[in-house]
């Protein structure tokens, strides 16, 4: 809430519930992203969000839980310290920071502890983490501040330029999920989108195809591909040979 900076719903308007409010709030209320591109942009609200998550997941109110937070590999030590301190102030007992790429490898069940290469490309909301892992360590990695949010903005721009239709990022994300792809699919899809005509100012809808969404996503996807290629080029030949067999 503007002015008081109070979190609605007695502090429960967090996460998916808050995301649903993006672009739909009255002037007195603001839906905020306390983290942008993997970096804290609003410390007070970030701590409120973490406090909510910790309370929701904690079974014992008297015991402070251990918290593991995945952070982009490209953030600075100062930014890491900010995340660490915010988690502590939010009620965490012990705080552990782990690179997003390593967390993604563990979550995907990859054999990152083995003496062989495992390659990960984790496309998040604000960043994309690319890494080659071996023996539980990161051999080569790169973090770029391009992710799902950038793709949503690209779709918003495409709809405005080609359809004279103004849509929000939530609608763009729905189109991306429903019809988006990096390569042609066997069965091309279509998605219906509603927005406001930029010329008449009247609400209307349009239907877009997978091919159009691929065109809209071309620039952010090309940036990710260039980063992937750069990581592979820095990799040792033996590990690169593993990637030929194991893929990404």
State what each model feature region is.
Residues 1-123, 131-248:
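Nucleotide/phosphate-binding catalytic cleft detector across ATP-hydrolyzing
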